[in-house]
Amino acid sequence: MPPKRNFRKRSFEEEEEDNDVNKAAISEEEEKRRLALEEVKFLQKLRERKLGIPALSSTAQSSIGKVKPVEKTETEGEKEELVLQDTFAQETAVLIEDPNMVKYIEQELAKKRGRNIDDAEEVENELKRVEDELYKIPDHLKVKKRSSEESSTQWTTGIAEVQLPIEYKLKNIEETEAAKKLLQERRLMGRPKSEFSIPSSYSADYFQRGKDYAEKLRREHPELYKDRGGPQADGEAAKPSTSSSTNNNADSGKSRQAATDQIMLERFRKRERNRVMRR
């Protein structure tokens, strides 16, 4: 026969010890959970908003201000809603102070500080009277009420406008233009001469003045120009033709004598115009 195997059997005492260890571990975990829950509940209570001052009087507060106890059968969501409703219903902000209460506090403070309330009130009344005198308007500065007969607007109401003839309109226009011209002349007379006598183009003004001056001389002294014109005509008849060298010299002299200020001014204007267009 084959030999029998020996199996180790756990005794009853070992099983009881294991059970005790498991129970102790479970009880420790439950205790930790209970402590954590109690801590959370305590923090929630600290975060709860306290009830404020009721807006109603003390008699109405005694009847209405009592909060009904919440039944244990309600769910947690309904409990939170009831707490919020009661909080907002009873919490109010006191903005208006009771005048009697303020007066009583001032009187008590004055008694403690050793002041006489009647004397203080008399001084305040005197100061108020002085201030009222400062703000008082004298009689000559007050606005007087005018009647409808005294006001100027009442005289013009109801009067029909009359259309003036064209002669009056033309006369007004002429007088206006004459007044404008006179005003402009006065303004120019008040300014120094150098401000409005500067020409817009120096080169054009120079040549124009020279031309006007030459014409003026020809009109006033024609005998001078007659003497100059005769020899020139005789000389031209005597010398009908000249050499090419003399012509070239004359042309070069004429081109040198030609004024280039106007040409340079036109070039400058073109350059500035092109520069502005590029921008």
From Swiss-Prot:
Residues 68-79, 217-229 have a biased composition (Basic and acidic residues). Residues 86-183 form a coiled coil. The keyword Nucleus applies. GO terms for biological process: negative regulation of ubiquitin protein ligase activity; primary root development; regulation of photomorphogenesis; response to high fluence blue light stimulus by blue high-fluence system. It is found in: Nucleus; Nucleus speckle. InterPro entries: Tls1-like. It comes from the Eukaryota. Residues 250-260 have a biased composition (Polar residues). Residues 1-29, 57-79, 217-279 are annotated as: Disordered. One of its GO terms (cellular component) is nuclear speck. Residues 270-279 have a biased composition (Basic residues). Keywords: Coiled coil, Nucleus. Pfam families: Hep_59. Belongs to the TLS1 family. Interacts with COP1. Inhibits E3 ubiquitin-protein ligase activity of COP1, a central repressor of seedling photomorphogenesis. Represses COP1-mediated turnover of HY5 in the dark. Required for primary root development under normal light growth conditions. This is Protein COP1 SUPPRESSOR 2. The lineage of its organism: Eukaryota, Viridiplantae, Streptophyta, Embryophyta, Tracheophyta. The gene is CSU2.
